[in-house]
């Protein structure tokens, strides 16, 4: 079974935390990843070489690695350069996710250049994080092995909505041949199922599983609305 086939029809859990989260730290991310594996997840998405190394030692699942690096010179921060991609690969990720939007990068590299470097120098697969249909088509043409709706709603020019961009999933499935992954604001099993009904190859869920404070807040807010 190929690496991509291992992900087909399954749940990928994004194990990430912000510095101000109570569960921030590589040991916690590794524990979340192990819990996800025990629950039946088919893959893990993780940020930073440190977290990826810790998770690699804890689970046998495929890891989609990213490295979020902010810069005053660019809005692009998800694995914004070939150097960042190399660090992700060396940490143990089998698939490297990159921001595949056409926005300029601090490294001055193009999406195509980064994808080529990942394929030829690192021998890894590429997940292209995109925000629009046009970006998904361009990412496929640039050589991406799969596209993900990760950035829909997180760029000023894409739809701003509370739930997942299922319409983008539907559009991509009709226009690209590579696997389409649904990611972003998927909070319930019903929304995940709806993504698969739209043709998603796999689904990525993060905060709805791995950020307890957000999970708690959703329950609290729902209870308040009932009063």
Predicted regions mapped to residue ranges:
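Conserved N-terminal beta1-alpha1 strand-loop-helix module at the mouth
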Residues: 1-90, 126, 134, 138-141, ...
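Residues at the C-terminal ends
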Residues: 38, 90, 120-121, 141, ...
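Structural motif
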Residues: 46-47, 66, 99, 129, ...
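Glycine-rich phosphate-binding active-site loops on the catalytic face of alpha/beta enzymes
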Residues: 16-18, 38, 67, 71, ...
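C-terminal alpha-helical cap/extension of soluble enzyme domains
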Residues: 3-23, 27-30, 164-227
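Active-site-adjacent beta->alpha loops and helix N-cap segments on the catalytic face
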Residues: 22-26, 45-64, 75-81, 100-118, ...
């Amino acid at each position: 079974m190929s690496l991509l086939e291992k992900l087909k029809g399954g749940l990928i859990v994004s194990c990430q935390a912000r510095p101000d989260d109570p569960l921030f730290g590589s040991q916690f991310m590794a524990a979340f990843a192990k819990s996800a594996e025990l629950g039946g997840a088919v893959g893990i998405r993780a940020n930073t070489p440190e977290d990826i190394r810790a998770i690699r030692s804890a689970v046998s699942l495929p890891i989609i690695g990213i490295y979020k690096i902010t810069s005053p010179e660019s809005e692009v921060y998800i694995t914004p350069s070939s150097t960042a991609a190399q660090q992700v690969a060396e940490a143990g990720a089998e698939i490297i996710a990159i921001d595949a939007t056409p926005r300029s990068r601090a490294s001055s590299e193009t999406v195509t250049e980064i994808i080529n470097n990942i394929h030829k120098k690192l021998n890894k697969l590429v997940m292209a994080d995109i925000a629009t249909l046009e970006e998904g088509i361009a990412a496929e043409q640039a050589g991406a092995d799969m596209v993900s709706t990760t950035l829909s709603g997180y760029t000023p020019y894409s739809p701003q909505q509370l739930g997942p961009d299922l319409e983008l999933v539907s559009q991509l499935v009709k226009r690209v041949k590579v696997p389409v992954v649904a990611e972003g604001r998927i909070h319930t099993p019903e929304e995940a199922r709806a993504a698969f009904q739209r043709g998603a190859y796999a689904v990525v869920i993060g905060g709805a599983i791995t950020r307890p404070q957000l999970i708690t807040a959703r329950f609290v807010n729902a209870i308040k609305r009932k009063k």
